[in-house]
Amino acid sequence: MGLFLLLFLLLPPCVQAEDVVYLTTEQFKARVFDYTKEREWKYKGDKPCVIDFYTTWCGPCKRLAPIMEELSQTYCDQVLFYKVDTERERELAYAFQIQSIPQVLYVPVEGKPILLKGLYPKESIVQIIEEQLIKRPTPALPTEGGSK
């Protein structure tokens, strides 16, 4: 029992957290936004989220998946990560006009979401999460000069 407790305490906090969660259309409407009842965007969550619209046969989607898994662990206590299979959830894909994949929806707790098409490098995704979802300012570069 003591060894189990020690291992549990030594594990990073996000090992026990959910990874990327697969959403159905109904789950999306319950957790994110019910586009059938609301006209204006109003996010239902209390943490920002990232939603990957994908299909199982899409090459770029397959390359994006491990990046999203990794980032779901990195930001597990700050950002929720979801996936929506556009082949299975056609109504939802249609509602968001998803015609090419992958597309990723970045949803802040307050304000409008950002929908980006295509595969972006991990560094760009991190920058969007940091600046648009977590709202951490980008560190300022030191300026040259000073008193003479």
Please provide the spans of the model-predicted regions.
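A short beta-strand-turn-helix
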Residues: 23-47
